[in-house]
Amino acid sequence: MSPPSDLPIAALSREQRLVFPSAADLNRALDLGVFYLKAPDDLNLASARQFGLELISQDSPFRDVPAYGELEGFIALENNQQTKLALRRERWDQHYPRDIAVFGRQLDAVGVAIMREVFHHSGIPEGLWDRASGGYTSGGGDAFLNFVHYDTRTPDWGLRPHTDYGFVTILDASAPGLQIEIDGQFEDVPVLPGHLVINFGEALNFITAHSERTVGAIVHRVLSQRSNDTVRHSIVYFANPNLDGTLWQFDANGEERGSSSVEDLFALLERNLTE
């Protein structure tokens, strides 16, 4: 499959604004719900990648991080090849090395900048951004920092086709395998050195649904990884609303247009991912 040659590329300005080469690139990114982002110069990717690579070793002490419910800890997904160390922001300082916790908070800043840019174009009044995002745009909400690798002993999908649950996903992947669905066809997303892949999720699509600029939630998958493939490991950051909160929809006049519990939306998406 050929790569999406027109996948937009953005960068963050000194003012933490998301900058695209043209309005057409911006609009395509918002429509598709996916784009490349130049990694900020101060983002310590090398250290984070090394940490993720070390998790592949069976004797890594971080494999002993306990499970917290179904979403956190050192866990494996059903019907997928993913094995991962997944932790919410509130547990980063407890379980991650200090430099990795700092790295996670750097991704917090990237996620907030992206969310604020989407809100700028949505027309939703700025005074409602915090409520619409469940507090995420002011440093609250929920966030996961996950280190993922793929168990080639199983013949399943690397990751089955799905959309993400939350607002924004930030991905750093070491090898090919990611594909996105455009016009009913899956296309490769090549690894672009020095860049992260950003995609939008269902919660962001939901809260912008009645605004001046609804954004897409991209369907994507990871191809089944084979034992002779380059070892694929990745860093994945999820910007989410509070998992026990409510999603609110506003229009450009600041009027409430609808709501849904986060729990209900995420439960539906979880069934789609694992069934």
Language-model-detected regions and their locations in the chain:
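Active-site environment of non-heme Fe oxygenases that use a 2-His-1-carboxylate facial triad
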Residues: 4-11, 112, 116, 146-150, ...
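Conserved cytochrome P450 K-helix E-x-x-R motif and the immediately C-terminal K′/meander segment
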Residues: 151, 164-175
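A generic secondary-structure signal for well-formed alpha-helical elements
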Residues: 52-60, 111-118, 122-126, 201-208, ...
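Active-site cores enriched in adjacent His and Asp/Glu residues with nearby glycine-rich loops
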Residues: 123-149
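Catalytic core of Fe(II)/2-oxoglutarate
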Residues: 2-7, 173-275
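N-terminal auxiliary "cap/dimerization" subdomain that precedes the catalytic jelly-roll/cupin core
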Residues: 1-93, 100, 111-112
